[in-house]
Amino acid sequence: MKKRVLSVGQCVPDDGALLRFLSSHFDVELVRSPDKEDALKRIRTEQFDLITVNRKLDADYSDGMDVIQSIQQDPDINTTPVMLVSNYPDAQEKAVQIGAEYGFGKMEYEKPEVVERVGKFLK
């Protein structure tokens, strides 16, 4: 059975790269969400195995940390693991501090440790 991943705030090319990475290692369906409002609505009404949030949302360049914080503060939706997509280690640390799993950067897709990190939720 396919695992479902919600991708929040990626541009179309980056979502394509994320889908190629994920589908080369796991049986996944990628669902795109452009912004915080849409993401929160989808999380409340659909089941996901993993949520990835871009550091800066492509639709309006808002802060992905706000999305993560909104998810983590809502007990009705904070059970799904969330990962930040960012190449910046300081951003990853901040995301972990507010409740996310340690994520990955767009330049790290094929690193074995990233495959293993994501695999905890998609195998």
What residue ranges belong to the model's regions?
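Conserved acidic segment of CheY-like receiver
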Residues: 2-13, 18-22, 51
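Short hydrophobic/Thr-rich beta-strand motif most characteristic of the beta2 strand and flanking loop
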Residues: 27-35
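Conserved phosphotransfer cores of two-component systems
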Residues: 44-46, 72-78, 98
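Conserved phosphotransfer microenvironments
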Residues: 52-71
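Alpha4 helix (beta4-alpha4-beta5 surface) of REC/receiver domains from two-component response regulators
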Residues: 63, 87-104
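A short, hydrophobic beta-strand element within the central beta-sheet of small alpha/beta folds
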Residues: 78-89
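C-terminal output helix
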Residues: 108-118
